[in-house]
């Protein structure tokens, strides 16, 4: 059975009056920089209590991963029930479909059970995705995901290279993400999708140069949907020219400059600038009173919060100095 694409219904900004007001009222509960700093200077138990104040379950009792995953699942479901337009939350769920796809394909190749590593945050139930992959029948699973999994499996069986399978699924993810964002019809969301693709391609270009890869390799890993043509990025690599001029008219210019300067050593600053550029984009929704931008920004803030919470608590449990953890943190939605 093939997947039928749903036409996303059109909505006016005023359709978002209720959910915008609701999410604005919940924003103070989000993890802020002030709360994160307090967690860094506290014990693991005290940090867990701070997370409870942000709406998370009891971390010491159920474990960090379950607490974070349960929080994401609850917020996704709540916003899906309240949002007037289909597609917005689905875009945020999509990354977990492809995470599960990578896990299932690679687990099959090495003969292990993928279940413990599967996420429940995707559009499709993880078990349904696994069944579709095993039977070749999409059922309720998006056909684009199943097709990409089959392509990745074929490539993996020929090459025995897990990275190649990941690259195929990454490209499929960005292609479907761009298509779905276009269907939703939100200029704000399409801008975010384009910025994500540009960020992914800049990271790929910087890493390719550090690894002394050629333009053919880089072309194979660049994803669709960005504003910078793949040919221009590959040409800069081939001619050993800096990438920053290509990104001069984008929000990623500072990150690109940092990438050009990071031929050796740590990429921490470069990676943080890339992520912070994405945070700065959705933070623009702060000036919007109501509309789908408010929903999109809240979901982005949630994902950032979960990443920060995981980084802080894991760092504290590992006994890392606060400054070391802080250097890895990204900007939070303020």
Q: What positions do the PLM features span?
A:
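N-terminal domain-start signal
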Residues: 1-334
């Amino acid at each position: 059975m093939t997947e039928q694409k749903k036409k996303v219904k059109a909505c006016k900004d005023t359709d978002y009056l209720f959910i915008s007001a609701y999410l604005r009222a919940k924003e103070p509960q989000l993890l802020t920089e002030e709360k994160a700093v307090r967690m860094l200077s506290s014990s693991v138990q005290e940090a867990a209590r701070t997370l409870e104040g942000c709406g998370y379950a009891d971390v010491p009792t159920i474990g960090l991963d379950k607490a974070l995953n349960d929080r994401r699942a609850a917020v996704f479901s709540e916003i899906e029930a309240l949002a007037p337009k289909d597609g917005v939350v689905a875009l945020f769920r999509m990354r977990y479909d492809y995470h599960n796809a990578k896990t299932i394909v690679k687990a099959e190749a090495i003969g292990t059970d993928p279940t413990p590593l599967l996420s429940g945050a995707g559009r499709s139930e993880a078990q349904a995705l696994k069944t579709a992959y095993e039977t070749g029948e999409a059922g309720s699973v998006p056909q684009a995901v199943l097709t990409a999994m089959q392509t990745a499996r074929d490539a993996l069986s020929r090459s025995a290279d897990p990275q190649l399978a990941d690259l195929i699924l990454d490209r499929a993810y960005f292609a479907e993400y761009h298509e779905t964002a276009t269907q939703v019809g939100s200029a704000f969301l399409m801008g975010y999708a384009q910025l994500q693709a540009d960020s992914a391609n800049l990271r790929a270009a910087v890493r390719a140069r550090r690894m002394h890869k050629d333009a053919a390799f880089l072309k194979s890993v660049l994803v669709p949907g960005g504003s910078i043509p793949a040919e221009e990025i590959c040409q800069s690599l081939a001619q050993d020219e800096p990438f920053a001029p290509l990104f001069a008219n984008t929000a990623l210019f500072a990150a690109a400059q940092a990438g050009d300067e990071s031929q050796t050593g740590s990429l921490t600053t470069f990676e943080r600038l890339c992520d912070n550029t994405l945070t700065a984009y959705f933070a623009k929704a702060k000036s919007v009173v109501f509309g789908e931008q408010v929903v999109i920004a809240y979901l982005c803030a949630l994902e950032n919060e979960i990443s920060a919470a995981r980084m802080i608590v894991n760092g504290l449990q590992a006994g890392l100095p606060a400054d070391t953890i802080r250097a890895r943190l990204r900007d939070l939605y303020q």
